[in-house]
Amino acid sequence: DQTLNEIRAGANGDAADNVPEEKEKMQASSAKLDDTPLTKKYARPELATLVEFPPSGSEWLHEIKYDGYRIMAFLEDGKVRLRTRGGKDWPHKFPGITDQLATINVSNAVLDGEIGVLNDRGATSFSALQDALSRQDPSQVEGWFFDLLHLRDDDLTKTPLLERKIALKKILSHKTLTLVHYSDHLESSPHLLKKACGIGAEGLVSKRKD
């Protein structure tokens, strides 16, 4: 069977959308930096709604749901800011991810994704992520990014999702990005949810392609 690591499909970070309260409060002492035009415009990520079964049909795509921490990456003039769903700025907590994002050759971009740690089964584990943070050892922490909200001078939120993902895949395609990954998606198919859970995923996040 394929592991989550092998299929390299990051979830819509909506993996953190319905997390217990203690996840939201983890490391809550982190300082918040001054806002920029981009952090003000894209202040909070879009959250998912929990349903029992994923929708089907060619107009939908599906992403593996990670057991990690939702993050938004702001790339502005060579500087990188990683902001949690709760508004905490964490670039210093994940220097490897921050440094690799800084090598991306774009002047301005906003990426939406998930940060997590893979366990021995190749599935993300929130407890492993929490352990890495408590030990102040972020070497095993990786980032999976599934959406591109802004690129250069353009707000892409009204652009069809598939087009945004194509652009995101392009800017994350460099081989040196070993800790930063493009989060791919799956097409609708029978038993898709069962297959996702079979490889250790928490579930699926489904989105309309348009």
Language model regions located:
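Catalytic cores of nucleic-acid ligases and guanylyltransferases
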Residues: D1-D210
